[in-house]
Each structure stands twice: as C-alpha cells, then as structure tokens.
C-alpha cells in the first residue's frame, strides 16, 4: 500500500516528481509491469523485505477503477491544490460505509436534553459516501492490494486521494485485520504531519479509503532525485517526524513501519506520515510479529522479542542516516546479511556525515531499546536545534508562553 505519482482529472498536473538514480534495493520479488492505463509505475527500487510481508510489496494484479462519471475537462491547475478549495462536508465514520465526522466539544452547561437534540440533528446530517460522489483522476501510486487515485468530491470540489483496495486480494492475503486497524487508528489522528483519513466506503468487490492529498508525493522520490539530503532538510524532516511520532505515542499508537516510502510531502513541503497498516495501539504492541521493511526493523523485532514504542526511535535513526547518506545503514546484498548487520548493529559513517548527526544516529541505533533517547531528547538534540528550520510543538508552546509573560 505505498508508492507515488499524467493523466489528470482535467489536464496535466505539474507536480509530478522526476525520478533519479536513487538508493538501490535488493529485489526479492519480480516486478511485473502493469498494462492498466490507470496504473502508475512506481519507479522505485525494492528493499529487502522480511518473510511475513515480502509478498505484499509487489505490483497489484491488473484491475481498473471504473467511475460512472467522466472527469471534468477544464479544471485549472490551482484547483488541484487541496489548500485552495473547501474540504468535503464532515461525515461520520462508523462500522458501515460512512465517513468520519469530527467531534465537536459540547458546551459544559448543556443539559442532557439539549445534548440529545444536538446529537439527533447531527445524526440527520450524516450520509454514506459512494463512488458516484467523486470524480476519479490520474493514479498517484500502486501497491499489492490496489491503487491510489487523485479524486475530487463533486459537491464541494475538494481535491483528495482515494485508495482503492480489492477485497479478494485482502482476503487471500489474510490482512483484513490490518486494514481495519489502519482505518481505526489513522481516522482518529489529528496532526499537521500525519496524513488525514477522512473516511471510507465499500462496494461488492472493493474498499475505498478517502485520504488527504499530498501534492508533492513521497519523500522516497525526492531522495531518489537528489541522492541525499543536506543537514537542514534532514534535521527539519526529523523534527517533523519526531513531533508526529510524539503525538502518536501520546495516543498509545506506534507506527512500526517508518520509511521514506511511507512519508509524503504536503503542498508547503511539510512531511506527512502515511500508511498506518502496520501500526498498533501500544497496549497490544508487545508482540513478536515480524512486519514492515527489514532495513528499518530494530533488533528486538527481527529477533522475535517483545517490543514497544522504542521501535519507532530505531527507525528514526535509520531514516536520519539514509537522508544524509542516501542508503540505509544496514543495507546488504542479501536478506541474511542485512539481518546479521541489524542484529549486531554493524554500520559505518561516510566521512561527509557531520559529527552532530553521527552522535544523534549512534544514540538512536542502540541494540537495547531502553538505551535509546526519547523523542523529546531527539527534538532537543544540539544538531537538530542548530539545523532544523521548524520548531517542534513543544518549542512553539515555550515560545508562546514566554511571549505572553
């Protein structure tokens, strides 16, 4: 359920990102080109994958999303920016086909009768989404279980993305629970650096997730184009990611699959965490499930030991290294060699990696999870503070408090 972004709702979109010679991955499954004109070629090298999900990162079978309405023919470029149009009317998310309705705070002095009346009025405004509510545009990405398409809600003209998943493929792979978990978790998260899941609906053969549109695509594409990032961009991305993960952990949610393919870029270039398919609520997170991409998995997971939110700190260290170097620290030619390097924490720094970054990465890549720093420590690390162009949420709060006093 990953990957990224000509064939538009109404004409060419100029936000497509050029591909480059990026970090190479060891292929574990044969890439088969899709013949479907609506399917976008991912263009990404594959990573070494662990056994439990190696089969989940291959292209989907050729399937075509059919809309009952033709796309509008004269949509202007500016309408493709999600920030420039109103968002669709709020709708509720429940266990059927409904979208989510943001909860509103009830006044503290409302009587039970007034509250019941208000809830009844809100209930009357709810409706179910259907494919006919959207104009479907060009494909943005593809995965084993389906594709992601640019779309526009007809009534509000709101630009968004729709992830289309095929039920038969989900059932065959036995990952229906993973999809339910993704919907349950992502739909309740509200953070500027987390991709919004507005709602979902389904028909006889497919499940549709209504997602926020990230115009600048996947971070992995940008990394391929530039080969590696400079200190300022790396520190800024790590700040945004640590801030979002701190929010997730406060909600007792751990992601467990942080990697460039699962990080998207909003219209202002801000990082957004996507794809919560492997995430879990922390109380049930002490599992020995081997999931996610091997390059980013910590020793406790590949060794089948219990784990907690510290797995995301390890992934943060791997990500920081890859941003600066252009490849993951434990990358090897075989699955077995990658496994061994992770288990022994064997990696080296190229000469051009700055000392401050080396210190942060070395602290994050500790075999013992309890020795890894907290996310607060990461945000307050001298190298991050000196190079990041964006303050963390906690820093913003401090600045706001100091101004008021």
From Swiss-Prot:
Covalent link Glycyl lysine isopeptide (Lys-Gly) (interchain with G-Cter in SUMO2), residues: 259
Gene (UniProt): AURKA
Keywords: ATP-binding, Cell cycle, Cell division, Cell membrane, Cell projection, Cytoplasm, Cytoskeleton, Isopeptide bond, Kinase, Membrane, Microtubule, Mitosis, Nucleotide-binding, Phosphoprotein, Serine/threonine-protein kinase, Transferase, Ubl conjugation
Species per Swiss-Prot/TrEMBL record: Canis lupus familiaris
Gene Ontology cellular-component terms listed: basolateral plasma membrane; centriole; centrosome; chromosome passenger complex; cilium; cytoplasm; kinetochore; neuron projection
Family matches, as Pfam families: Pkinase
Phosphothreonine carried by residues: 288-289
Compositionally biased intervals (Basic and acidic residues): 111-127, 396-405
Span list, region Activation segment: 281-294
CDD domains: STKc_Aurora-A
Broad class of enzyme this protein falls into: transferase
Description of post-translational modifications: Activated by phosphorylation at Thr-289; this brings about a change in the conformation of the activation segment. Phosphorylation at Thr-289 varies during the cell cycle and is highest during M phase. Autophosphorylated at Thr-289 upon TPX2 binding. Thr-289 can be phosphorylated by several kinases, including PAK and PKA. Protein phosphatase type 1 (PP1) binds AURKA and inhibits its activity by dephosphorylating Thr-289 during mitosis. Phosphorylation at Ser-343 decreases the kinase activity. PPP2CA controls degradation by dephosphorylating Ser-52 at the end of mitosis. Ubiquitinated by the E3 ubiquitin-protein ligase complex SCF(FBXL7) during mitosis, leading to its degradation by the proteasome. Ubiquitinated by CHFR, leading to its degradation by the proteasome. Ubiquitinated by the anaphase-promoting complex (APC), leading to its degradation by the proteasome. Ubiquitinated by the CUL3-KLHL18 ligase leading to its activation at the centrosome which is required for initiating mitotic entry. Ubiquitination mediated by CUL3-KLHL18 ligase does not lead to its degradation by the proteasome.
Entries under SMART domains matching the protein: S_TKc
Role played: Mitotic serine/threonine kinase that contributes to the regulation of cell cycle progression. Associates with the centrosome and the spindle microtubules during mitosis and plays a critical role in various mitotic events including the establishment of mitotic spindle, centrosome duplication, centrosome separation as well as maturation, chromosomal alignment, spindle assembly checkpoint, and cytokinesis. Required for normal spindle positioning during mitosis and for the localization of NUMA1 and DCTN1 to the cell cortex during metaphase. Required for initial activation of CDK1 at centrosomes.
A GO BP entry: meiotic spindle organization
GO-annotated molecular function: ATP binding; protein serine/threonine kinase activity
Self-association and partners: Part of a complex composed of NEDD9, AURKA and CTTN; within the complex NEDD9 acts as a scaffold protein and is required for complex formation. Identified in a complex with AUNIP and NIN. Interacts with FBXL7. Interacts with CPEB1, JTB, TACC1, TPX2, PPP2CA, as well as with the protein phosphatase type 1 (PP1) isoforms PPP1CA, PPP1CB and PPP1CC. Also interacts with its substrates ARHGEF2, BORA, KIF2A, PARD3, and p53/TP53. Interaction with BORA promotes phosphorylation of PLK1. Interacts with CIMAP3. Interacts with GADD45A, competing with its oligomerization.
Major location category of this protein: cytoplasm
Protein name per Swiss-Prot or TrEMBL: Aurora kinase A
Biased composition (Polar residues): 32-82, 91-110
Similarity-based family: Belongs to the protein kinase superfamily. Ser/Thr protein kinase family. Aurora subfamily.
Modulation of this protein's activity: Activation of CDK1, appears to be an upstream event of AURKA activation. Phosphatase inhibitor-2 (PPP1R2) and TPX2 act also as activators. Inactivated by the G2 checkpoint. Inhibited by GADD45A and p53/TP53, and through dephosphorylation by protein phosphatase type 1 (PP1). MLN8054 is also a potent and selective inhibitor. Activated during the early phase of cilia disassembly in the presence of CIMAP3. Inhibited by the small molecule inhibitor VX-680.
């Amino acid at each position: 359920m990953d990957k990224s972004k000509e064939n538009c709702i109404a004409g060419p979109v100029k936000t497509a990102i050029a591909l480059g010679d990026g970090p190479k991955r060891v292929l574990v499954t044969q890439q088969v080109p899709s013949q479907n004109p609506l399917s976008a070629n991912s263009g990404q090298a594959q990573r070494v994958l662990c056994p439990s999900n190696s089969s989940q990162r291959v292209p989907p079978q050729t399937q075509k999303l059919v809309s009952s309405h033709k796309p509008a023919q004269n949509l202007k470029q500016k309408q493709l920016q999600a920030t420039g149009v109103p968002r669709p009317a709020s709708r509720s998310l429940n266990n059927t086909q409904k979208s989510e309705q943001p909860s509103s705070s009830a006044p503290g002095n409302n009587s039970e009768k007034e509250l019941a009346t208000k809830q009844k009025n809100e209930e009357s405004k709810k409706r179910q989404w259907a494919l006919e509510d959207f104009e479907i545009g060009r494909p943005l990405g593809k995965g084993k279980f389906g594709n992601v398409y640019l779309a526009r809600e007809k009534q509000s003209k709101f630009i968004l993305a729709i992830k289309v998943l095929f039920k038969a493929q989900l059932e065959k792979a036995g990952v229906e629970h993973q999809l339910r978990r993704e919907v349950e978790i992502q739909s309740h998260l509200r953070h500027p650096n987390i991709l919004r899941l507005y709602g979902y609906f389904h028909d006889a053969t497919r499940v549709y997730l209504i997602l926020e549109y990230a115009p600048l695509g996947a971070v992995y594409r940008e990394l391929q184009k530039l080969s590696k990032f400079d200190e300022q961009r790396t520190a800024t991305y790590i700040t945004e990611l640590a801030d979002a993960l701190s929010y997730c952990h406060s909600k007792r949610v751990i992601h467990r699959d942080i990697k460039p393919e699962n990080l998207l870029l909003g219209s202002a270039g801000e990082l957004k965490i996507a794809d919560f398919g492997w995430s879990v609520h922390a109380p049930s997170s002490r599992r020995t499930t081997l999931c996610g991409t091997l390059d980013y998995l910590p020793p406790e997971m590949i060794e089948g030991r219990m784990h907690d939110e510290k797995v995301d700190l390890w992934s943060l260290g791997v990500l920081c290294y890859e941003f600066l170097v252009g490849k993951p620290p434990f990358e090897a030619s075989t699955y077995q060699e990658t496994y061994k390097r992770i288990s022994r924490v064997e990696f080296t720094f190229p000469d051009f990696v700055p000392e401050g970054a080396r210190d942060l990465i070395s602290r994050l890549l500790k075999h013992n999870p309890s020795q890894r720093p907290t996310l607060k420590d990461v945000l307050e690390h001298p190298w991050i503070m000196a190079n990041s162009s964006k303050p963390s949420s906690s820093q913003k709060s401090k600045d706001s408090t100091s101004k008021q006093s």
